[in-house]
């Protein structure tokens, strides 16, 4: 996707495919003679997942998706699920680097029917001259939530899936 970054940082994007897995790699380098410090939204990688409702209910069921994004630094993923529930679905798992957040760029004239473009943001970094860092992820097909987590565990050895019956507890409640 499109990448935006501050002046003085260059980006080199490469991609490759092995079977049904697509690997995308973004290497960012400080090309100045001064240190550069980034904040969360200084670097943006656009990931235009098709999460909108602009084509009518019937078409949305097969051609659009719900996009679930977890930016958990070095354990980050995107799980896209077709609105109709029928596989295949698209997944993305981070395999190198760190993502600390995401934002959405949308056309407000379309109101809530277009969720917009999702923009993933690498974690803030401090780069000395000629220093670089890399963001790499793998894109893959999956058959639903259970298959997604199974494939993520195969594709990324650092992935940890945390789940709980309830993520908000009140005093005296048990954690299951």
List PLM regions with ranges:
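Acidic (Asp/Glu-rich), glycine- and aromatic
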Residues: 3-13, 17-68
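Beta-strand-rich recognition/accessory modules
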Residues: 4-6, 18, 42-46, 50, ...
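Short, exposed beta-strand "edge-strand" segments with a Pro/Gly-rich flavor and a Y/T-containing core
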Residues: 33-35, 142, 167-168
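Short, solvent-exposed loop/linker segments at the N-terminal edge
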Residues: 165-173
């Amino acid at each position: 996707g499109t990448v935006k970054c501050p002046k003085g940082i260059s980006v080199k994007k490469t991609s490759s495919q092995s079977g049904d897995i697509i690997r995308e790699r973004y290497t960012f380098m400080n090309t100045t003679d001064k240190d550069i410090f980034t904040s969360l939204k200084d670097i943006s990688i656009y990931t235009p997942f098709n999460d909108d409702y602009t084509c009518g209910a019937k078409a949305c069921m097969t051609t659009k998706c719900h996009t679930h994004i977890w930016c958990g630094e070095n354990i980050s993923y995107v799980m896209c699920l077709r609105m109709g529930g029928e596989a295949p679905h698209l997944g993305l798992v981070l395999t190198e680097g760190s993502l600390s957040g995401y934002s959405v760029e949308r056309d407000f004239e379309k109101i809530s029917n277009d969720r917009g473009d999702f923009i993933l943001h690498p974690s803030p970094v401090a780069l000395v001259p000629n220093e670089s860092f890399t963001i790499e992820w793998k894109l893959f097909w999956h058959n639903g939530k259970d298959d997604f987590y199974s494939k993520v565990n195969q594709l990324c050895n650092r992935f940890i899936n945390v789940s709980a019956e309830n993520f908000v507890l009140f005093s005296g409640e048990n954690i299951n």
